[in-house]
Swiss-Prot record:
Stated family: Belongs to the universal ribosomal protein uL10 family.
Cross-link (Glycyl lysine isopeptide (Lys-Gly) (interchain with G-Cter in SUMO1)): K297
Species: Homo sapiens (Human)
Gene Ontology CC annotation, any one: cytosolic large ribosomal subunit
Keyword Phosphoprotein: yes
Name under which the protein is recorded: Putative ribosomal protein uL10-like
Residue intervals passing through the bilayer: none
Gene: RPLP0P6
Stretches with biased composition (Acidic residues): 302-311
Length: 317
């Protein structure tokens, strides 16, 4: 079958990306740095039936989206995020589930000299199994060691590389000698596009409990500000009513003015002993039946033992 020319390929690519943007209401913009063709094939196979992965040149993706803005203006939000080595992951499934599947398809990778570290690398304290001739190599990296049974032992954990640092040749060589693969590469979600809205992938970590607690925190903050400024809102009115009632009650106690709800408070302040005396009486009334029941149980037990003896069921008979 003859290979299609470049113009036909471009036309088909534009049609494909437009069709996917229309058919799928949700997608991820993903970074594909350090992802090889073999790993990309594995990702496509593991997510088959759930997602469609589309890669391509940024200029072509932007051109296709700009040409479709008249039909779908919300797609304009995607344009500022199409830069670098990126692609699209289209889906109709739950976004959190697909995110977890993408994370599961990351593969460990060795450190390469000149690469930018995506995470912090710490070498743990351990016996390296390397001979004493490598001691100068560790000293050059500032790693404290000792010779133990003819091999080099690292005495404490060492932060070798910081996030964002360029991996040096010495660091890469050391990690390879220790068989440490500190990095993991895969498709990295940079932005989430969901029914016309675009947001950071961290939003997917928000649970209903988190949203509920944040909402209540906001309500408390609004109520506090409104109470301090005297501006009534639904959040602050209940507190304003309670505070007002407390002030009226305090005024009633200090003056001759009274109302039914204040009578009990005034009576308590006038004679607290009357309320204290009521508690022991209630306790005595509940304790009396229990005390009366105890002798009755003892008497019943004694009668039962006597009847057993009368019937001749003694232990040594």
């Amino acid at each position: 079958m003859p290979r299609e020319d470049r113009a036909t390929w471009k036309s088909n690519y534009f049609l494909k990306i437009i069709q996917l943007l229309d058919d799928y209401p949700k997608c991820f913009i993903v970074g594909a740095d350090n992802v090889g063709s073999k790993q990309m094939q594995q990702i496509r196979m593991s997510l088959r039936g759930k997602v469609v992965v589309l890669m391509g040149k940024n200029t072509m993706m932007r051109k296709a989206i700009r040409g479709h803005l008249e039909n779908n203006p919300a797609l304009e939000k995607l344009l500022p995020h199409i830069w670098g080595n990126v692609g699209f992951v289209f889906t109709k499934e739950d976004l959190t589930e697909i995110r977890d599947m993408l994370l599961a398809n990351k593969v460990p990778a060795a450190a390469r000299a000149g690469a930018i570290a995506p995470c912090e690398v710490t070498v743990p304290a351990q016996n390296t199994g390397l001979g004493p001739e490598k001691t100068s190599f560790f000293q050059a990296l500032g790693i404290t060691t000792k010779i133990s049974r003819g091999t080099i032992e690292i005495l404490s954990d060492v932060q070798l590389i910081k996030t964002g640092d360029k991996v040096g040749a010495s660091e890469a060589t050391l990690l390879n000698m220790l068989n440490i693969s500190p990095f993991s590469f895969g498709l990295v979600i940079q932005q989430v596009f969901d029914n016309g809205s675009i947001y950071n992938p961290e939003v997917l970590d928000k649970t209903e409990e988190t949203l509920h607690s944040r909402f209540l925190e906001g309500v408390r903050n609004v109520a506090s500000v409104c109470l301090q400024t005297g501006y009534p809102t639904v959040a602050s009115v209940p507190h304003s009513i309670i505070n007002g009632y407390k002030r009226v009650l305090a005024l009633s106690v200090e003056t001759d003015y009274t109302f039914p709800l204040a009578e009990n408070v005034k009576a308590f302040l006038a004679d607290p002993s009357a309320f204290v005396a009521a508690a022991p009486v209630a306790a005595d009334t509940t304790a009396a039946p229990a005390a009366a029941a105890a002798p009755a149980k003892v008497e019943a037990k004694e009668e039962s033992e006597e009847s057993d003896e009368d019937m001749g069921f003694g232990l040594f008979d």
